[in-house]
């Protein structure tokens, strides 16, 4: 990639690449940076040659549009391309991007399991949920602590001699009341969630 050219006489927008200028220049090659005809000299990028990046028009997030006279965002001077590529150009406004980004990212990144709090891909969601629900809760042995043993990581208070504790199979120890509260919501050791 070459160096970025700058000119003192050209004004800058508060956000690079965002402008009210509505011009886009079609690319002469399949993927690259191109100068637009507007005052800002904005760039358009064609992603039509990138495999798997040709979604239907209804699935495109705001700011991405197909070039061509029959599209909602693609019409206008200088944006037509015989290949019908997908462009991100000066027509992509900051408001459009901020409006769609949280929903688009959330829809494509999976979900957080309410049982184990792991992030799971959306195609594995059902199987993961079944596995989490069928996993048995950890059992523990309750005991009375014979000597001071550091800190309970749930309540962050000291484990003192004489406290009623719970010892998990992984040998972690907690106040019995703390781990009982923890197991009402979770099914794993607070320090070893993957076990």
Swiss-Prot record:
Question: Kind of enzyme, top EC level?
Answer: transferase
Give the RING-type zinc finger regions: 152-193
The annotated regions of Polar residues compositional bias extend over: 1-10
Low complexity composition bias: residue spans: 18-29
Tell me, what's a Pfam family for it?
A: zf-RING_2
Q: Where does the record place the region Disordered?
A: 1-37
Which membrane topology term applies here?
Answer: Peripheral membrane protein
Q: What does this protein do?
A: E3 ubiquitin-protein ligase that plays a role in neuron cells differentiation. Plays a role in the establishment and maintenance of neuronal transmission and plasticity.
What name goes with this protein?
E3 ubiquitin-protein ligase ZNRF1
């Amino acid at each position: 990639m070459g160096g970025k050219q700058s000119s003192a006489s050209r004004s800058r927008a508060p956000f690079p690449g965002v402008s009210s200028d509505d011009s886009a220049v079609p690319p002469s090659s399949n993927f690259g940076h191109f100068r637009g005809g507007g005052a800002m000299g904005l760039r358009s990028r064609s992603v039509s040659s990138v495999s798997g990046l040709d979604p239907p028009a209804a699935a495109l997030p705001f700011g991405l549009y197909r070039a061509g006279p029959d599209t909602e965002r693609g019409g206008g001077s200088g944006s037509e391309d015989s290949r019908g590529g997908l462009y991100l150009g000066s027509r992509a406004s900051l408001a459009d991007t901020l409006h769609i980004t949280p929903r688009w990212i959330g829809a494509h990144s999976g979900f957080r399991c309410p049982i184990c709090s792991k992030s799971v891909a959306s195609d594995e969601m059902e199987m993961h949920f079944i596995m989490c629900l069928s996993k048995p809760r950890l059992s523990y042995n309750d005991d009375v602590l014979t000597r001071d043993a550091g800190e309970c990581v749930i309540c962050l208070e000291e484990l003192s001699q004489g406290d009623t504790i719970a010892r998990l199979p992984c040998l972690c120890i907690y106040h019995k009341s703390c781990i009982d509260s923890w197991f009402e919501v979770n099914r794993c050791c607070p320090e070893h969630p993957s076990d």
